[in-house]
């Protein structure tokens, strides 16, 4: 009797586990929800532009970035560091669903930021171009996407400072820093490694490696937490300041920056 009771209990538990597994598909649920959110963004673009001041419209907003506290969709211009994230999300939706609806949307929003391929005033080339054109090229093998990516990589390395061994980040706040390099910049190196694989040009590989090693040396503390901003002397390459621009204080670990480094 005890054996039968135990066996029945085991079967009930196994059945419950099996049922729970069938009812929960985290990946599908996540993509379904993401699809709903992205489609909602499409419906809000026109109204968001209609409510924008003329000055904002002159900046040519093209990519949804977030929802404001008042429920309005926030759009950003191609020059914004997040402009490549939305088209990147659309490419992931296409990859998962194989639905041409998402492919067409991804192509349209990707094309909106092509002008950034020659923007030498930003270090965010990987964020913008590799998330968008990079995923597009990976999924379609479009030769035009490849050329745009290579031009983007060539633009990015113009910001490399050999004396320092890093790609310069921001150009603003010159009264505060000479040559700021932020931990976020690690995320842009993938574009350079890709360019090396595609072209065989070791310049891309060497710059990416040197930047990573310099960052490892100067951005990280003994406990492996990281600073957000390292400011370098443009002539000597020496470290001038170790700051945390968006974290709690200069000696804190800014969580988002810590993730960028990883």
Name the predicted role of every residue range.
Residues 21-262:
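Glycan-recognition and catalytic cores of secretory/periplasmic carbohydrate-active enzymes
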Residues 1-25:
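Bacterial Sec-dependent N-terminal signal peptides
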